[in-house]
Amino acid sequence: MGKRILPQRMGRGTPTFRSPSHRRVGPAKYPPLKLDRTIKGKIIDLLHDPGRWVPLAKIVLEDGTTFLTPAVEGMYVGQIIEIGPDAHISNGNILPIGKIPEGTQIANIEKRPGDGGKFVRSSGTYALIVGRAGTKTQVQLPSGKIIEVPNNARATIGVIAGGGRDEKPLLKAGNAYHKWKVKAKKWPKVRGVAMNAVSHPHGGGSHQHVGKPSTVARETPPGRKVGHIAARRTGRRKG
């Protein structure tokens, strides 16, 4: 009899596969909407969050409200930022996207007003405002896709900090171990064909091969449900 394969163990949710969220600094999102006026805030700290690839800026507002937001390039401790419709077009300021000129680099964009920021939050990324369409603003994401968001959704002026993070080589497996230890990722990821037959349906044999169809049905039982699950097609496209 075989043993429980890796996907079955993952589903049980033991600490090995669970995200260490207790180490996180906190949620990074904008404070509640205050579109009727512009307020100022001060960056009191720049924090490293083990669960992110980007540093966080801790900001305290005039009314004492404190919040975290992904830092943009050029931010520094002690910097005064503005939040609101009349804020200047300056690095780190937060404005409704309808008030930002076309061609401006922006980040941490709200999908809906008040959701705290959903788009362009990864290190080194930015979006561009490319046009207007009534009550919507057209934004080009880092992928090249153009989306429309409401004019009163907020965004930060600038480029998310931490660009070039993945340019430094890991060099050794120990560095990769620590990289993924703080994430909800199991590392290393071993191929099924490299395992023994007892550990995976694709394992075993005198050479590495699947040995059976790699496409399985959606209703396949857990110990066999590996490979191409309910695939419509596999392989290279032809023609």
UniProtKB/Swiss-Prot annotation:
It comes from the Archaea. One of its GO terms (biological process) is cytoplasmic translation. One of its GO terms (molecular function) is rRNA binding. The keyword rRNA-binding applies. GO terms for cellular component: cytosolic large ribosomal subunit. Residues 225-239 have a biased composition (Basic residues). Keywords: Ribonucleoprotein, Ribosomal protein, RNA-binding, rRNA-binding. Residues 1-28, 199-239 are annotated as: Disordered. One of the primary rRNA binding proteins. Required for association of the 30S and 50S subunits to form the 70S ribosome, for tRNA binding and peptide bond formation. It has been suggested to have peptidyltransferase activity; this is somewhat controversial. Makes several contacts with the 16S rRNA in the 70S ribosome. PANTHER family: LARGE RIBOSOMAL SUBUNIT PROTEIN UL2 (PTHR13691:SF16), RIBOSOMAL PROTEIN L2 (PTHR13691). Part of the 50S ribosomal subunit. Forms a bridge to the 30S subunit in the 70S ribosome. HAMAP family: Ribosomal_uL2_A. This is Large ribosomal subunit protein uL2. It comes from Staphylothermus marinus (strain ATCC 43588 / DSM 3639 / JCM 9404 / F1).
